[in-house]
Amino acid sequence: MTQSSSVERLVGEIDEFGYTVVEDVLDADSVAAYLADTRRLERELPTVIANSTTVVKGLARPGHVPVDRVDHDWVRIDNLLLHGTRYEALPVHPKLLPVIEGVLGRDCLLSWCMTSNQLPGAVAQRLHCDDEMYPLPRPHQPLLCNALIALCDFTADNGATQVVPGSHRWPERPSPPYPEGKPVEINAGDALIWNGSLWHTAAANRTDAPRPALTINFCVGFVRQQVNQQLSIPRELVRCFEPRLQELIGYGLYAGKMGRIDWRPPADYLDADRHPFLDAVADRLQTSVRL
């Protein structure tokens, strides 16, 4: 099967069922490297702690995860693009990005990139869809398309994502009793990709080991990203990104004109110390600000 036909099949599965699985996105050595490095980040950085209703409880200081399991079931490191070239490779991965683009279009954006570590004993998440914050009639065109790369084998016992196939086409949110989800059991290194309208949940982790993963979420180019990467990633670092990654975090244009600076993409100004348009009108702007 050619790459284009494989991508077409995967995009078709997302359209029909709301999700698909891409096998062997990471090999065993890469899984081990990401797992070791994300553990290092959890030791060295403040971590986001959240409970299974997806309520963020706050930040834990480096190397310390509170033991009060009533308060939290998840540990996350946000904005992974700040933490090394291995993470820069994830949003542009050749097995992932073509599928995302097939769902959202070439003008899509990276919404966020983070670790998602479900702790032992975590209870199941509530049934939810990732685009429920948008006040739009359902079903609607795909607004979000998300990828989760397993850093261990995902099983029904350790918190494998449970999906309700076809629910991305439902006209309204479900009411209790909620439908039972189908566990998507995948191997370490595989990726689950789903339409943001798909109703799903992370099952309870009934084991004594964490269930680590990498999450790479995308949105169409005309909605707001969850993480403001234009401000949170230093420009000096963005200059080192490959051009496609620069576009994905917001330095490109949507439909050839949205997000522009002087009718040019923001990436054109990454190497400029000052914006040429501002140079031309600096005195006038300063006067206007004083007024």
Swiss-Prot record:
Q: Which superkingdom?
A: Bacteria
Task: Write out the GO MF terms.
Answer: 2-oxoglutarate-dependent dioxygenase activity; iron ion binding
**Gene Ontology CC annotations of this record:** plasma membrane
Coiled-coil region(s): none
Q: Which InterPro entries match?
A: Phytyl_CoA_dOase-like
Give the family, as the similarity comment puts it.
Answer: Belongs to the PhyH family.
Please give the PANTHER family that the UniProt record associates with this protein.
Answer: ECTOINE DIOXYGENASE, PHYTANOYL-COA DIOXYGENASE DOMAIN CONTAINING 1
Q: What is this protein called?
A: Uncharacterized protein Rv3633
Record organism: Mycobacterium tuberculosis (strain ATCC 25618 / H37Rv)
